[in-house]
Amino acid sequence: MNNIHDSISLIEQYLDINNAEYQVHGNNIEIYPLEKSVIRIKFNNSEIEIISQAKEYSFDKINNNFFSQLQSLIT
């Protein structure tokens, strides 16, 4: 997994480009999509989790699959 701070910066850039409302709390990101429940991104020891109301997704690194899944949740 990339450095956590680098990963958070990369995700923040992506969210800014997509005009998403979000807040960073330590190693967690909360995303507030319009008319949907909060989405959380959590950085654990060896994985990155995207947690939505419906499901949790785990990734070992930030890649196209990560951003594709995130995009489907925020739009």
Per-region residue spans from a language model:
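Acidic, low-complexity, intrinsically disordered interaction modules
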Residues: 32-58
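Short intrinsically disordered terminal tails
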Residues: 1-2, 73-75
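Negatively charged, low-complexity tracts enriched in Asp/Glu with abundant Ser/Thr
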Residues: 1-29, 53-68
